[in-house]
């Protein structure tokens, strides 16, 4: 049997950003073509693959799909394709988009979060879900915390991203790039993000596995902010890489497990 093999196209782009670059590449094994991925990141990534096949058939029977790449994976096989004829030209064109996290994990389990501050403390919600200043269309919460107050993990997970180099702030969206924040990935595929931390205000690093209630940083007033506070949001990515913020319930001392309301004050047990 004699084949001529053509790799028609191979490139990858990223939805949002990633801590480390995911690599997708092919390898010829006889008349088969194997598609592999390397993922140096500390959390899983998802590859959306679209193929242009010439006289080839994939092991999953289609020409596009979503494939989860485990964290720290090297040479992880995504798919393979076989020739459908014994002689002649075969080819595999490949396009991919990389989404952060495991977007195939769409579990709807309701998790009760701990308030992200010290036990016995009480804070007011200065801006709630879909708030008028900077939360329009976003399920995020602002806790009215002064600069330098301790911030604790509301839920355990893996620290995916830490930014703490910024000191600038203003009341305009143009300052959003100056947010200091910590981003934590959870086992159900969701993320939690703690924003406006003070300069050098992180007490964790990328790759740390934190437990609920661990100290992770210190509140501040960086980025797009009208004053000192802690911005907290939980979100997931759908199967097209679109970010969806989620309403969450918190465990409180006096109101039980509840959704926090703007201007309400809540105490941690």
Which sequence ranges carry the predicted segments?
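Surface-exposed, glycine-biased beta-strand/turn segments
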Residues: 68-70, 75-178
């Amino acid at each position: 049997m004699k084949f001529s093999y053509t790799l028609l196209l191979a490139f990858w782009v990223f939805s949002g950003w990633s801590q480390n670059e995911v690599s997708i590449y092919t390898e010829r094994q006889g008349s088969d073509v194997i598609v592999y991925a390397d993922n140096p990141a500390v959390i899983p990534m998802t590859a959306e693959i679209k193929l242009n096949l010439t006289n080839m058939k994939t092991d999953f029977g289609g020409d596009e799909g979503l494939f989860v790449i485990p964290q720290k994976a090297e040479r992880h096989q995504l798919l393979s394709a076989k020739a459908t004829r014994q002689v002649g030209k075969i080819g595999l064109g490949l396009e991919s988009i990389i989404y952060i996290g495991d977007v195939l994990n769409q579990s709807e389990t309701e998790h009760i979060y701990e308030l992200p501050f010290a036990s016995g403390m009480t804070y007011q919600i200065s801006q709630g879900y879909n708030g008028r200043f900077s939360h329009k269309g976003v399920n995020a919460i602002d806790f009215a915390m002064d600069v330098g107050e301790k911030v604790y993990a509301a839920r355990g997970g893996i620290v995916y991203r830490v930014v703490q180099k910024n000191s600038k702030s203003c009341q305009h969206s143009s300052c959003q790039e100056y947010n200091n924040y910590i981003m934590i990935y959870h086992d159900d595929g969701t993320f939690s993000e703690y924003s406006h931390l003070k300069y050098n205000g992180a007490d964790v690093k990328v790759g740390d596995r934190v437990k609920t209630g661990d100290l992770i940083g210190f509140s501040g007033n960086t980025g797009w902010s009208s004053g000192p506070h802690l911005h907290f949001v939980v979100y997931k990515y759908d199967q097209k890489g679109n970010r969806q913020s989620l309403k969450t319930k918190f465990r409180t001392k006096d109101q039980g497990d509840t959704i926090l309301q703007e201007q309400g004050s809540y105490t941690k047990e």
